[in-house]
Regions:
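N-terminal small-domain helix-loop-helix segment of the aminotransferase-like
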Residues: 4-103
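Glycine-rich "substrate-gating" loop/helix at the edge of Rossmann-like oxidoreductase active sites
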Residues: 4-9, 179-181, 241-242, 269-272
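Helix C-cap/helix->beta junction micro-motif
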Residues: 25-28, 137, 197-198
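Conserved core of the PLP fold type I
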Residues: 59-193, 210-211, 215-228, 235
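Residue-level marker for buried hydrophobic side chains located in beta-strands
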Residues: 202-203
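Walker B catalytic acidic pair
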Residues: 206
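PLP-dependent aminotransferase class I/II
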Residues: 233-285
Length: 285
């Protein structure tokens, strides 16, 4: 039987490899948890009441569009956090951001760019969902170093112009995991200007946006609005896993241009599953 080769070089997922390394630690001493980065605080206590009150919702199929109460809650949060007003057609509820980061590439990456195979940019180190989306599409994944000498963020603008013309998507995680670097407003402006010049989309993985000490980090939506960028230029991905101590809920959202959101939603209607309504009500709360 023939099997595809496009995932042949995909390594085992990071967490099983990490478990294999940590399972053989020597006896004695105080163990330090270095496995998956789960929150160490309790989930908000009122959420159990919301879930229990709406448990009957598991008996029906959820809407692919998302319930109005949740879409309105996301609208309100984006307006308060980033001073950006979005319509509900610019928001999509996700089963965690990993779903969205992968599906967005599948739904939005063109077959050709500048007469050649498209390029998908991502920082190195990177979240595996970025790479597997590029591999699934058969496009060129370009891993751009995010080291001390680059400020722990990828310097996409230093790539050759002929490569940048082929770029369809550039992923960026800010605040970055695992480096902890934060893209400031100047970095976002430079990246958005680069995307405008070479006509590619920015997928901003902002799952850690609410983890900071003093000043909230700027977001791609607010900088794109200030610059008057093309409405489809950026997508912003968010999650409740870290900010609300709810990694098991698998709940997040993506926000951006209405045509991009329509295409991602259309793909999931065929190849995915929306978040169950009781869990959407928990997220809205």
């Amino acid at each position: 039987m023939a099997f595809p080769e496009r995932f042949s070089n995909l390594p085992e997922y990071a967490f099983p490899r990490l478990r294999a390394l940590l399972d053989h630690h020597p006896a004695g001493g105080v163990p330090v948890a270095m496995t998956i980065g789960e929150p160490r605080h309790e989930m908000p206590p009122f959420l159990a009441e919301v879930l229990n009150a709406n448990i009957a919702g598991f008996a029906k199929y959820p809407s692919n569009e998302g319930i109005p109460a949740l879409l309105a809650a996301i609208q309100g949060w984006i307006a308060r956090r980033y001073d950006v007003a979005l319509g509900q057609e610019q928001i999509m509820v996700l089963n965690g951001t990993r779903e969205g980061l992968y599906n967005a590439a599948v739904a939005l990456c063109p077959e050709r760019k500048a007469g050649a195979a498209p390029v998908v940019l991502m920082p190195n180190p990177f979240y595996q969902a970025y790479a597997v989306g590029a591999l699934a599409l058969g496009v060129q994944a370009e891993y751009v170093p995010a080291r001390r000498d680059t400020g722990y963020l990828p310097q996409y603008g230093q790539l050759p112009p002929e490569m940048l013309d082929r770029v369809a998507i550039a992923y960026l995680c800010s605040p970055a995991n695992p480096q902890g670097a934060v893209a400031d407003a100047a970095y976002w402006r430079d990246l958005i200007a680069l995307a405008e010049r070479h006509d590619f989309q920015i997928f901003a993985d902002e799952c850690y946006s609410e983890i900071y000490r003093d000043t909230p980090p700027p977001g791609v939506l607010q900088i794109a609005r200030e610059m008057g960028a093309h409405p489809e230029r950026v997508l912003s991905f968010h999650s409740l896993s870290k900010r609300s101590n709810l990694p098991g809920l698998r709940s997040g959202f993506v926000a951006g241009g209405p045509e991009s959101i329509r295409r991602i939603r259309q793909l999931r209607a065929y190849a995915g599953a929306p978040l169950p309504e009781p869990l959407q009500l928990v997220e809205a709360a």
